[in-house]
A protein has these predicted regions:
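Composition-driven recognition of glycine/serine/threonine/acidic- and proline-rich low-complexity segments
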Residues: 1, 5-178
Length: 179
């Protein structure tokens, strides 16, 4: 319903605001995340919007909430974010993602979603704990096993989309999908 979408949007906005503050501390660049757009979608609709490979970061909720959270970032955005995290200027990121990049983006998302879970825990007055994130490069245009990306993507799910800017280096969309 519209009321449920509004509630999810409001909660997501608070959580991502906290996550943006955490990301700022990791990349030392101003991070701005806009008001979210909330919709019910499915795998086919989602993949139609992504022509290039994307990085899926899957985070399971261990306590307090049932389900998981999948963040979808563009490959180039991950390169810039991880370059900044490793002391670079973000202007000349590596041409290809390596295990070091996946480790760094998982650490960033672990800290961001950890702070987000803490905010959510305060709002709901219950303990919320997350699993360590797992990241993988997913070719959205190819045939992939939906279960490999996340076992909930084979049915309708909630998608929350934010516009995210990081300094003058990243102007992109971050997608968070919830079961």
């Amino acid at each position: 319903s519209d009321e449920e979408k509004d509630a999810i949007g409001e909660i997501s906005n608070i959580c991502m605001g906290t996550a943006a503050t955490t990301l700022y501390s990791l990349v030392n660049q101003k991070v701005v995340i806009t008001t979210p757009v909330v919709e019910i979608t499915n795998w086919d609709k989602l993949t139609a919007e992504y022509a290039k490979p994307c990085v899926f970061i899957n985070i399971l909720y261990k306590d307090g909430i049932d389900g998981n959270n999948v963040l979808i970032l563009k490959e180039d955005d991950v390169k810039v974010i991880t370059d900044l995290m490793m002391g670079g200027d973000g202007l000349n990121p590596a041409p290809e993602l390596t295990e070091l990049h996946f480790s760094a983006i998982c650490e960033a998302m672990n800290q961001m979603m950890g702070s987000s879970a803490t905010s959510l825990s305060s709002m709901l007055n219950c303990k919320i704990d997350i699993s360590p994130p797992e990241a993988e490069l997913v070719d959205m245009a190819g045939n992939i096993d939906v279960a490999k990306a996340s076992d909930f993507l084979d049915k309708d799910f909630v998608r929350v989309t934010f516009r995210m800017t990081i300094g003058d280096l990243v102007d992109s969309t971050i997608t968070v999908s919830y079961t």
